Amino acid sequence: MDPDRQADIAALDTTLTTVERVLDVDGLRNRIEQLEKDASDPNLWDDQTRAQKVTSDLSHAQNELRRVEGLRQRLDDLPVLYELAAEAGGPDEVAEADAELAKLREDIEAMEVRTLLSGEYDEREAVVTIRSGAGGVDAADWAEMLMRMYIRWAEKHDYPVEIFDTSYAEEAGIKSATFAVHAPFAYGTLSVEQGTHRLVRISPFDNQSRRQTSFADVEVLPVVETTDHIEIPENDIRVDVYRSSGPGGQSVNTTDSAVRLTHIPTGIVVTCQNEKSQLQNKVSAMRVLQAKLLERKRLEERAELDALKGDGGSSWGNQMRSYVLHPYQMVKDLRTEYEVGNPASVLDGDIDGFLEAGIRWRNRKDDD
Protein backbone atom coordinates (compact mmCIF):
# COMPACT_ATOMS: atom_id res chain seq x y z
CA MET A 1 0.00 0.00 0.00
CA ASP A 2 1.38 3.42 -0.91
CA PRO A 3 2.20 5.93 1.89
CA ASP A 4 -0.68 8.29 1.05
CA ARG A 5 -3.29 5.57 1.53
CA GLN A 6 -1.58 4.41 4.73
CA ALA A 7 -1.72 7.99 6.05
CA ASP A 8 -5.42 8.26 5.13
CA ILE A 9 -6.23 5.04 7.00
CA ALA A 10 -4.20 6.15 10.03
CA ALA A 11 -6.05 9.48 10.12
CA LEU A 12 -9.41 7.70 9.96
CA ASP A 13 -8.31 5.40 12.78
CA THR A 14 -7.49 8.43 14.95
CA THR A 15 -10.88 10.01 14.23
CA LEU A 16 -12.81 6.80 14.87
CA THR A 17 -10.92 6.15 18.12
CA THR A 18 -11.94 9.62 19.30
CA VAL A 19 -15.56 8.92 18.34
CA GLU A 20 -15.50 5.62 20.26
CA ARG A 21 -14.12 7.37 23.33
CA VAL A 22 -16.65 10.22 23.23
CA LEU A 23 -19.57 7.83 22.70
CA ASP A 24 -18.22 5.56 25.48
CA VAL A 25 -18.77 2.28 23.62
CA ASP A 26 -18.35 0.14 26.75
CA GLY A 27 -20.87 2.33 28.57
CA LEU A 28 -23.20 2.02 25.58
CA ARG A 29 -23.04 -1.78 25.81
CA ASN A 30 -23.87 -1.62 29.53
CA ARG A 31 -26.79 0.72 28.82
CA ILE A 32 -28.16 -1.67 26.19
CA GLU A 33 -27.94 -4.52 28.69
CA GLN A 34 -29.93 -2.52 31.26
CA LEU A 35 -32.52 -1.39 28.70
CA GLU A 36 -32.97 -5.00 27.55
CA LYS A 37 -33.72 -5.96 31.16
CA ASP A 38 -36.21 -3.10 31.42
CA ALA A 39 -37.83 -4.11 28.12
CA SER A 40 -38.30 -7.70 29.32
CA ASP A 41 -40.22 -6.57 32.42
CA PRO A 42 -43.74 -8.07 32.06
CA ASN A 43 -45.22 -5.00 33.77
CA LEU A 44 -43.47 -2.50 31.50
CA TRP A 45 -46.54 -1.68 29.39
CA ASP A 46 -48.58 -0.78 32.46
CA ASP A 47 -46.99 2.63 31.90
CA GLN A 48 -47.20 3.20 28.14
CA THR A 49 -45.20 6.43 28.19
CA ARG A 50 -42.28 4.76 29.97
CA ALA A 51 -42.58 1.65 27.79
CA GLN A 52 -42.37 3.68 24.59
CA LYS A 53 -39.32 5.54 25.90
CA VAL A 54 -37.56 2.32 26.93
CA THR A 55 -38.15 0.64 23.56
CA SER A 56 -37.18 3.79 21.66
CA ASP A 57 -33.99 4.27 23.69
CA LEU A 58 -33.09 0.60 23.28
CA SER A 59 -33.55 0.70 19.51
CA HIS A 60 -31.46 3.88 19.22
CA ALA A 61 -28.67 2.54 21.45
CA GLN A 62 -28.52 -0.75 19.53
CA ASN A 63 -28.41 1.08 16.19
CA GLU A 64 -25.67 3.41 17.43
CA LEU A 65 -23.56 0.49 18.69
CA ARG A 66 -24.02 -1.42 15.43
CA ARG A 67 -23.05 1.68 13.50
CA VAL A 68 -19.79 2.37 15.35
CA GLU A 69 -18.84 -1.34 15.49
CA GLY A 70 -19.53 -1.62 11.77
CA LEU A 71 -17.23 1.34 11.06
CA ARG A 72 -14.46 -0.23 13.14
CA GLN A 73 -14.82 -3.55 11.31
CA ARG A 74 -14.74 -1.85 7.90
CA LEU A 75 -11.65 0.14 8.87
CA ASP A 76 -9.89 -3.02 10.09
CA ASP A 77 -10.77 -4.76 6.81
CA LEU A 78 -9.50 -1.94 4.59
CA PRO A 79 -5.75 -2.83 4.64
CA VAL A 80 -6.69 -6.41 3.73
CA LEU A 81 -8.76 -5.09 0.84
CA TYR A 82 -5.73 -3.18 -0.48
CA GLU A 83 -3.52 -6.26 -0.07
CA LEU A 84 -5.96 -8.34 -2.11
CA ALA A 85 -6.06 -5.58 -4.74
CA ALA A 86 -2.25 -5.58 -4.94
CA GLU A 87 -2.19 -9.36 -5.34
CA ALA A 88 -4.81 -9.20 -8.08
CA GLY A 89 -2.75 -6.55 -9.82
CA GLY A 90 -5.69 -4.99 -11.66
CA PRO A 91 -6.85 -1.35 -11.64
CA ASP A 92 -10.47 -2.35 -10.94
CA GLU A 93 -9.58 -3.94 -7.61
CA VAL A 94 -7.60 -0.86 -6.53
CA ALA A 95 -10.48 1.40 -7.59
CA GLU A 96 -12.86 -0.70 -5.49
CA ALA A 97 -10.61 -0.32 -2.43
CA ASP A 98 -10.30 3.44 -3.05
CA ALA A 99 -14.10 3.72 -3.28
CA GLU A 100 -14.45 1.96 0.08
CA LEU A 101 -11.84 4.29 1.59
CA ALA A 102 -13.78 7.34 0.36
CA LYS A 103 -17.12 5.97 1.59
CA LEU A 104 -15.63 5.03 4.96
CA ARG A 105 -14.21 8.54 5.36
CA GLU A 106 -17.67 9.98 4.66
CA ASP A 107 -19.36 7.63 7.14
CA ILE A 108 -16.82 8.23 9.92
CA GLU A 109 -17.11 12.01 9.47
CA ALA A 110 -20.89 11.70 9.73
CA MET A 111 -20.50 9.71 12.96
CA GLU A 112 -18.08 12.33 14.25
CA VAL A 113 -20.82 14.96 13.91
CA ARG A 114 -22.89 13.00 16.44
CA THR A 115 -20.18 13.71 19.06
CA LEU A 116 -20.71 17.46 18.58
CA LEU A 117 -24.25 17.24 19.96
CA SER A 118 -23.41 18.05 23.56
CA GLY A 119 -25.82 20.91 24.29
CA GLU A 120 -28.12 20.85 27.32
CA TYR A 121 -31.14 19.67 25.33
CA ASP A 122 -29.44 18.16 22.27
CA GLU A 123 -30.29 14.57 23.17
CA ARG A 124 -34.02 15.35 23.38
CA GLU A 125 -36.74 14.52 20.90
CA ALA A 126 -37.91 17.48 18.81
CA VAL A 127 -41.10 19.46 18.24
CA VAL A 128 -41.08 21.14 14.82
CA THR A 129 -43.42 23.95 13.74
CA ILE A 130 -43.55 25.23 10.16
CA ARG A 131 -45.37 28.46 9.24
CA SER A 132 -45.96 29.89 5.78
CA GLY A 133 -44.58 33.38 5.27
CA ALA A 134 -44.68 35.93 2.48
CA GLY A 135 -45.78 34.63 -0.90
CA GLY A 136 -49.49 33.88 -0.66
CA VAL A 137 -50.66 30.48 -1.87
CA ASP A 138 -47.12 29.65 -3.04
CA ALA A 139 -45.86 30.18 0.50
CA ALA A 140 -48.57 27.89 1.88
CA ASP A 141 -47.61 25.25 -0.67
CA TRP A 142 -43.94 25.76 0.21
CA ALA A 143 -44.67 25.24 3.91
CA GLU A 144 -46.32 21.92 3.09
CA MET A 145 -43.33 20.91 0.93
CA LEU A 146 -41.01 21.61 3.87
CA MET A 147 -43.20 19.56 6.18
CA ARG A 148 -43.00 16.64 3.77
CA MET A 149 -39.21 17.07 3.51
CA TYR A 150 -38.70 16.71 7.25
CA ILE A 151 -41.15 13.81 7.56
CA ARG A 152 -39.40 12.01 4.68
CA TRP A 153 -36.04 12.61 6.42
CA ALA A 154 -37.43 11.05 9.60
CA GLU A 155 -38.87 8.10 7.68
CA LYS A 156 -35.51 7.42 6.00
CA HIS A 157 -34.00 7.12 9.49
CA ASP A 158 -36.92 5.10 10.90
CA TYR A 159 -37.82 7.91 13.32
CA PRO A 160 -41.49 7.98 14.36
CA VAL A 161 -43.33 11.23 13.61
CA GLU A 162 -46.39 12.42 15.54
CA ILE A 163 -48.43 15.19 13.90
CA PHE A 164 -50.08 17.45 16.48
CA ASP A 165 -51.74 20.06 14.31
CA THR A 166 -52.13 21.05 10.66
CA SER A 167 -53.79 24.32 9.70
CA TYR A 168 -54.68 24.08 6.01
CA ALA A 169 -54.75 27.08 3.68
CA GLU A 170 -57.83 27.80 1.57
CA GLU A 171 -56.47 27.09 -1.92
CA ALA A 172 -53.49 24.79 -1.34
CA GLY A 173 -50.80 24.01 1.19
CA ILE A 174 -50.79 24.82 4.89
CA LYS A 175 -50.73 27.91 7.05
CA SER A 176 -48.84 26.02 9.75
CA ALA A 177 -48.13 22.56 11.11
CA THR A 178 -46.64 21.16 14.30
CA PHE A 179 -45.23 17.67 14.69
CA ALA A 180 -42.83 15.74 16.90
CA VAL A 181 -39.86 13.63 15.79
CA HIS A 182 -39.44 10.86 18.35
CA ALA A 183 -35.75 10.02 18.28
CA PRO A 184 -32.82 10.67 20.62
CA PHE A 185 -30.83 13.74 19.52
CA ALA A 186 -33.61 14.82 17.16
CA TYR A 187 -33.57 18.29 18.72
CA GLY A 188 -29.79 18.69 18.55
CA THR A 189 -29.85 17.60 14.93
CA LEU A 190 -32.88 19.49 13.65
CA SER A 191 -32.31 22.68 15.64
CA VAL A 192 -29.88 23.84 12.92
CA GLU A 193 -32.91 24.00 10.59
CA GLN A 194 -34.50 26.81 12.58
CA GLY A 195 -34.93 29.96 10.54
CA THR A 196 -36.44 31.19 7.28
CA HIS A 197 -36.36 28.95 4.19
CA ARG A 198 -36.70 30.62 0.76
CA LEU A 199 -38.06 28.99 -2.40
CA VAL A 200 -37.66 30.36 -5.94
CA ARG A 201 -39.62 28.63 -8.72
CA ILE A 202 -42.14 29.06 -11.53
CA SER A 203 -45.42 29.29 -9.65
CA PRO A 204 -47.83 26.43 -10.44
CA PHE A 205 -50.63 28.75 -9.26
CA ASP A 206 -49.85 31.62 -11.67
CA ASN A 207 -51.68 31.54 -15.02
CA GLN A 208 -48.80 33.46 -16.61
CA SER A 209 -46.18 31.03 -15.20
CA ARG A 210 -44.16 33.78 -13.57
CA ARG A 211 -41.31 33.20 -11.20
CA GLN A 212 -42.33 33.43 -7.55
CA THR A 213 -40.31 33.76 -4.35
CA SER A 214 -41.87 32.23 -1.24
CA PHE A 215 -40.85 32.02 2.40
CA ALA A 216 -41.58 29.70 5.31
CA ASP A 217 -40.32 29.72 8.88
CA VAL A 218 -39.15 26.65 10.78
CA GLU A 219 -39.12 26.50 14.57
CA VAL A 220 -37.53 23.57 16.45
CA LEU A 221 -38.05 22.97 20.18
CA PRO A 222 -36.87 20.25 22.57
CA VAL A 223 -39.53 17.96 24.01
CA VAL A 224 -40.13 18.74 27.67
CA GLU A 225 -39.31 16.05 30.22
CA THR A 226 -40.52 15.74 33.81
CA THR A 227 -37.14 16.90 35.12
CA ASP A 228 -37.63 20.33 33.50
CA HIS A 229 -40.18 21.41 36.11
CA ILE A 230 -42.23 23.47 33.66
CA GLU A 231 -45.29 24.01 35.82
CA ILE A 232 -48.20 26.00 34.40
CA PRO A 233 -50.89 27.20 36.82
CA GLU A 234 -54.34 26.25 35.60
CA ASN A 235 -55.49 29.88 35.83
CA ASP A 236 -52.76 30.88 33.35
CA ILE A 237 -54.34 28.86 30.53
CA ARG A 238 -57.47 29.56 28.51
CA VAL A 239 -58.88 26.49 26.78
CA ASP A 240 -61.02 26.82 23.64
CA VAL A 241 -62.51 23.87 21.74
CA TYR A 242 -63.71 23.75 18.14
CA ARG A 243 -64.25 21.34 15.28
CA SER A 244 -61.23 19.98 13.43
CA SER A 245 -60.89 21.19 9.85
CA GLY A 246 -59.18 19.81 6.77
CA PRO A 247 -58.06 21.21 3.40
CA GLY A 248 -60.26 24.02 2.12
CA GLY A 249 -61.77 24.57 5.54
CA GLN A 250 -63.94 21.44 5.42
CA SER A 251 -64.87 19.93 8.76
CA VAL A 252 -63.31 16.52 9.43
CA ASN A 253 -64.97 15.93 12.79
CA THR A 254 -68.56 16.28 13.92
CA THR A 255 -67.56 16.97 17.54
CA ASP A 256 -65.63 19.81 19.12
CA SER A 257 -62.44 17.75 19.54
CA ALA A 258 -59.85 20.33 18.45
CA VAL A 259 -58.21 22.28 21.28
CA ARG A 260 -56.64 25.73 21.43
CA LEU A 261 -54.56 26.64 24.49
CA THR A 262 -53.66 30.27 25.21
CA HIS A 263 -50.99 30.96 27.82
CA ILE A 264 -52.34 34.22 29.21
CA PRO A 265 -49.11 35.67 30.72
CA THR A 266 -47.11 35.31 27.48
CA GLY A 267 -49.83 35.23 24.82
CA ILE A 268 -48.44 31.97 23.38
CA VAL A 269 -51.15 30.05 21.49
CA VAL A 270 -51.01 26.32 20.71
CA THR A 271 -53.58 24.29 18.78
CA CYS A 272 -53.97 20.55 18.30
CA GLN A 273 -56.62 18.80 16.22
CA ASN A 274 -55.06 15.60 14.88
CA GLU A 275 -56.02 13.32 17.79
CA LYS A 276 -59.45 11.67 17.90
CA SER A 277 -60.58 13.00 21.25
CA GLN A 278 -60.61 16.38 22.94
CA LEU A 279 -58.64 14.96 25.89
CA GLN A 280 -55.89 13.57 23.64
CA ASN A 281 -55.66 16.88 21.79
CA LYS A 282 -55.42 18.78 25.07
CA VAL A 283 -52.60 16.52 26.30
CA SER A 284 -50.69 16.97 23.03
CA ALA A 285 -51.25 20.73 23.01
CA MET A 286 -49.99 20.95 26.59
CA ARG A 287 -46.78 19.15 25.58
CA VAL A 288 -46.17 21.70 22.82
CA LEU A 289 -46.98 24.61 25.14
CA GLN A 290 -44.50 23.30 27.71
CA ALA A 291 -41.85 23.02 24.98
CA LYS A 292 -42.48 26.62 23.91
CA LEU A 293 -42.25 27.87 27.50
CA LEU A 294 -39.03 25.91 28.03
CA GLU A 295 -37.55 27.50 24.90
CA ARG A 296 -38.69 30.93 26.07
CA LYS A 297 -36.95 30.35 29.39
CA ARG A 298 -33.79 29.16 27.62
CA LEU A 299 -33.72 32.20 25.33
CA GLU A 300 -34.21 34.56 28.28
CA GLU A 301 -31.27 32.93 30.07
CA ARG A 302 -29.19 33.18 26.87
CA ALA A 303 -30.07 36.88 26.52
CA GLU A 304 -28.96 37.51 30.11
CA LEU A 305 -25.69 35.70 29.44
CA ASP A 306 -25.11 37.67 26.22
CA ALA A 307 -25.74 40.90 28.12
CA LEU A 308 -23.16 39.90 30.72
CA LYS A 309 -20.70 39.01 27.95
CA GLY A 310 -21.35 42.37 26.28
CA ASP A 311 -22.57 41.06 22.92
CA GLY A 312 -25.91 40.98 21.24
CA GLY A 313 -26.11 37.24 20.83
CA SER A 314 -27.06 35.49 17.63
CA SER A 315 -30.40 34.86 15.99
CA TRP A 316 -31.48 31.92 13.81
CA GLY A 317 -34.64 33.69 12.79
CA ASN A 318 -33.18 35.00 9.53
CA GLN A 319 -33.03 33.55 6.04
CA MET A 320 -30.74 30.54 6.29
CA ARG A 321 -31.31 28.46 3.16
CA SER A 322 -32.31 29.09 -0.43
CA TYR A 323 -34.01 26.49 -2.65
CA VAL A 324 -33.86 27.58 -6.30
CA LEU A 325 -35.83 25.53 -8.84
CA HIS A 326 -35.75 28.17 -11.62
CA PRO A 327 -33.88 29.50 -13.61
CA TYR A 328 -31.29 26.98 -12.35
CA GLN A 329 -31.47 24.24 -9.73
CA MET A 330 -29.59 24.64 -6.46
CA VAL A 331 -30.16 24.34 -2.72
CA LYS A 332 -27.65 26.41 -0.76
CA ASP A 333 -27.23 27.03 2.95
CA LEU A 334 -26.34 30.68 3.40
CA ARG A 335 -24.49 30.10 6.71
CA THR A 336 -22.34 27.10 5.86
CA GLU A 337 -22.07 27.57 2.06
CA TYR A 338 -23.00 23.87 1.72
CA GLU A 339 -24.93 23.34 -1.50
CA VAL A 340 -26.55 20.59 -3.55
CA GLY A 341 -27.53 20.78 -7.22
CA ASN A 342 -30.40 18.29 -6.89
CA PRO A 343 -33.38 20.01 -5.19
CA ALA A 344 -35.68 17.03 -5.85
CA SER A 345 -33.49 14.80 -3.69
CA VAL A 346 -33.28 17.41 -0.93
CA LEU A 347 -37.04 17.95 -0.90
CA ASP A 348 -37.46 14.18 -0.65
CA GLY A 349 -35.65 14.23 2.68
CA ASP A 350 -31.99 13.87 1.73
CA ILE A 351 -30.81 16.64 4.06
CA ASP A 352 -28.14 14.87 6.13
CA GLY A 353 -25.38 16.84 4.41
CA PHE A 354 -27.05 20.13 5.36
CA LEU A 355 -27.62 18.93 8.93
CA GLU A 356 -24.01 17.83 9.38
CA ALA A 357 -22.65 21.06 7.89
CA GLY A 358 -25.00 23.07 10.11
CA ILE A 359 -23.94 21.23 13.27
CA ARG A 360 -20.25 21.78 12.48
CA TRP A 361 -20.94 25.47 11.74
CA ARG A 362 -22.80 25.91 15.02
CA ASN A 363 -20.02 24.19 16.93
CA ARG A 364 -17.43 26.56 15.45
CA LYS A 365 -19.63 29.57 16.28
CA ASP A 366 -20.01 28.39 19.88
CA ASP A 367 -16.23 28.07 20.17
CA ASP A 368 -15.64 31.65 18.99
Swiss-Prot record:
Pfam families: PCRF, RF-1. PROSITE patterns: RF_PROK_I. GO terms for molecular function: translation release factor activity, codon specific. Keywords: Cytoplasm, Methylation, Protein biosynthesis. It is found in: Cytoplasm. It comes from the Bacteria. Its main location: cytoplasm. InterPro entries: PCRF, Pep_chain_release_fac_I, Pep_chain_release_fac_I_sf, PrfB. The modification N5-methylglutamine is found at Q250. Methylated by PrmC. Methylation increases the termination efficiency of RF2. GO terms for cellular component: cytoplasm. Peptide chain release factor 2 directs the termination of translation in response to the peptide chain termination codons UGA and UAA. Belongs to the prokaryotic/mitochondrial release factor family. This is Peptide chain release factor 2. It comes from Mycolicibacterium smegmatis (strain ATCC 700084 / mc(2)155).
